[in-house]
Design a protein with these regions (language model features):
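N-terminal periplasmic "start-of-domain" segments of outer-membrane beta-barrel proteins
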Residues: 28, 33-64, 92, 100, ...
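Flexible loop and strand-edge segments within Gram-negative outer membrane beta-barrel domains
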Residues: 203-224, 230-282, 291-309
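A beta-strand signature from Gram-negative outer-membrane beta-barrel systems
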Residues: 124-165
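Short acidic/polar hinge/loop motifs at secondary-structure boundaries
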Residues: 92, 110-137, 225
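Extracytoplasmic beta-strand/coil segments of soluble accessory domains associated
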Residues: 70-111
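C-terminal beta-signal and adjacent terminal beta-strands/loops
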Residues: 574-588, 612-679
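Membrane-embedded beta-barrel scaffold of Gram-negative outer-membrane proteins
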Residues: 284-298, 408, 414-416, 448-506
Length: 679
């Protein structure tokens, strides 16, 4: 009981804040006022965006009892989410068949989750904090930087001017996970607004459903808080905020032996200032500044990894709308990162006796000017052409061109095309933190920062029928790498090799989406995606990227009764097969049969369901995840070679070869409390 006290205190503070909020509004009769809201189906393709953009709104984020940002993609076909390893609980995503490191993450158009915050950062953005998530495929605007290769994921938080001055959410999972979220907004004056966001979660029990002696999920405790502010007058708008994260997670063998102990601390502060230069708002200037500090300490058995990061990002933007048809945005941005890293693998007695590993410092600096021209003819045709001149310390100058076309030949048809270049500096260990959950030796320069270079192009056609709410969408996108860091598990069974790309590397992705409302209050989303992703591996040639599923299909159904008093959500997902590592081909299950005939994972289904009952001011919900109870067998490889807790880790030990669910069936229940503004 003592372990749950911090969460209980947070819940008490949340309810106290609700009372204070209600008193501060000075309403005459709050209970007599009814607020009618529209609960949308939860996700849709944006008609107005130039890029092919999927929007998951607040209703979509409520379809599951989760959730953080990673879990919100569980029922999405565009984004695949999985585990980086079976020990730390780190989540990773894939877009267009490629790792999430090639997808730029934004918080209200401000770059986030790069560097040390990336491996666990998807769990640091609670779903109840968000208004929506926008998933854009292809090459986005040059204004946000050169880093995007496969697309952008932008999150919109609840605003200081929110119509919901208080929101509280608490949920409990059958695996003992407790999750509490609070959002409280307040108008301090007609010009000054603020919102406070709080989150706490913890796992209190050990689970080993596959009986391999390892925790299926780490015991974790996370606290997360943000304070966001807005000052607004006609002459200027200022937004600023601060946030902090504390995350502790322990995994590995139960009762001792090989264990992981991860401690992550993060501080962030940002400032956004915007000023109109004309009364009609046709010209404006804005400045964005962001600072992040991360501290990551990880113990992997006897191995130790420590990382410290200081990051600064600044962007000066000028926009001028010359006429209704012509718009020009120019500016200059700068990004600076300093990393202090040390790594001691602890795989041999010599590693242990040599003492702490030396700290290696690296400073990454890049930036430059950019310009973006927009030409549009009403809603019929849009052209966006952008160019960045990016300078990288140690590498030199690069041009980053991008172009987007949107054409609406008829009211019911929208065509889009997009192409552009993306650049990013690789962070070998941070980008692939799962390599630390192995006993394999590292071969190559795993602390260098190679400049990765890729070109992405593609298009989308969306046909609307039987009104604005029904559509069929088809899209294709292709990414080609000119330079890439390859992390190769298969060159040698007991080593992981890091080396530059020595041939082709590409991903082709096809996707079809059908959204329909067959009858009132019933919506259906059917999505299918096929991916062909291959890379050249040293000594093996061009091969399919391992552990990356080639197919995913999702069917999402929702039905609401009148006045949305009852909401029923059901999602079925079919996950295609993936190529396994060569050293996994001969693995056998408990029945003696090969686990991966033909060297591929099985096709498996997953089911999710939730029932929500809405009352005045609060909702109750109960649901289930992974109702098929499908789990990956033999998640931890080589652990049977560990005869006692004192022996060193075998070289064949690998906890990073994860392609499917680790946890089985989960049941959840929760409550949402909402206080609306009344006038």
């Amino acid at each position: 009981m003592k372990k749950s006290r911090p969460l209980s205190v947070m819940a008490l503070l949340a309810l106290s804040a609700a009372v204070c909020q209600a008193q501060s509004e000075e309403r005459v009769d709050t209970l007599a006022t009814s607020v009618v809201t529209a609960y949308h189906s939860g996700g849709t393709l944006s008609r107005g965006q130039d890029l092919r953009t999927e929007i998951i709104n607040s209703a979509g984020l409520m379809k599951m009892a989760c959730c953080n940002l990673a879990e919100s993609f569980e029922n999405s076909a565009a984004v695949t989410v999985g585990y980086a390893d079976a020990a730390t609980g780190a989540r990773q995503i894939r877009l267009l068949g490629l790792s999430g490191i090639y997808t730029q993450m934004l918080d209200e158009s401000r770059p986030i989750l790069h560097g040390l915050s990336a491996p666990f950062g998807l769990s640091y953005i609670p779903g109840p904090w968000l208004e929506s998530i926008q998933i854009a495929k292809g090459s986005p605007s040059v204004v946000s930087g050169p880093d995007s290769m496969t697309g952008q994921i932008n999150v919109e938080h609840r605003k200081p001017t929110d119509e919901i001055p208080f929101f509280f959410n608490a949920s409990r999972m059958s695996d003992s996970r407790l999750d509490v979220n609070v959002a409280s907004s307040l108008a301090l004056s007609p010009s000054l607004y603020t919102i406070t966001l709080g989150h706490a979660e913890a796992n209190f029990k050990d689970h080993d459903m596959n009986m391999d002696g390892f925790l299926d999920e780490p015991r974790a405790r996370q606290f997360n808080v943000q304070s966001r502010w807005l000052y607004y007058i006609p002459e200027v708008q200022v937004r600023w905020g601060v946030g902090a994260v504390s995350d502790n997670r322990r995994g590995g063998q139960m009762g001792g032996g090989w264990q992981t102990d991860i401690k992550n601390r993060q501080l962030n502060a940002y400032l956004k200032v915007g000023r109109p230069l004309r009364e009609d708002q046709s010209a404006s200037v804005a400045w964005v500044a962001d600072y992040t500090h991360d501290r990551l300490d990880g113990a992997y058995g006897r191995g130790l990894y420590t990382g410290r990061q200081h990051s600064v990002f600044t962007n000066l933007i000028y926009r001028n709308q010359f006429s209704e048809a012509h718009d020009l945005t120019t500016g200059v941005s700068l990004s600076w990162d300093r990393y202090d890293e040390s790594l001691s693998r602890g795989l041999t007695l010599n590693d242990v006796l040599s003492g702490p590993a030396p700290v290696q410092r690296s400073e990454l600096l890049h930036g430059g000017p950019y310009g973006e021209y927009t030409f549009h003819v009403h809603h019929k045709f849009n052209l966006v052409a952008g160019l960045r001149g990016e300078w990288y310390r140690g590498t030199g100058f690069r041009l980053v061109p991008r172009i987007t076309l949107k054409f609406e030949p008829a009211e019911s048809l929208i065509l889009r095309a997009n192409a552009g270049r993306g650049l990013r500096e690789a962070l070998p260990l941070i980008d692939h933190l799962g390599v630390l959950s192995t006993g394999k030796y590292f071969d190559g320069d795993y602390l260098s920062h190679q400049l990765e270079d890729a070109w992405t192009w593609g298009g989308n056609a969306t046909w609307y029928f039987a009104g604005e709410t029904n559509y069929l969408s088809l899209d294709f996108f292709s990414t080609r790498f000119a330079d890439q860091l390859i992390v190769d598990y298969e060159q040698n069974p007991v080593t992981i090799a890091f080396y530059p790309l020595e041939g082709k590397s590409y991903s082709n992705s096809w996707q079809a989406d059908l959204h329909a409302e067959p009858f009132e209050r019933f919506t259906m989303d059917l999505t299918a995606r096929y991916t062909d992703a291959k890379s050249t591996f040293r000594g093996a040639g061009l091969r399919e990227i391992p552990l990356s599923p080639n197919l995913k299909g999702v069917l999402a159904l929702q039905y609401k009764t009148r006045l949305s008093r009852w909401i029923f959500d059901f999602t079925a997902a079919l996950n295609g097969s993936a190529r396994v590592y060569d050293f996994m081909k001969d693995l056998r299950g408990d029945d003696g049969q090969l686990l991966y005939p033909g060297g591929r994972t099985p096709v498996y289904p997953q089911l999710f369901a939730q029932v929500t009952r809405r009352f005045k001011g609060f909702d109750l919900y109960v649901g289930g995840e992974n109702l098929t109870n499908f789990r990956q067998e033999k998640v931890i490889l080589g652990f049977d070679q560990i005869s006692n807790p004192e022996q060193f880790l075998p070289q064949h030990f690998d906890a990073s070869a994860v392609w499917g669910p680790i946890m089985g069936l989960k049941i959840n229940a929760g409550i949402r409390v909402t206080i609306w503004k009344t006038y």
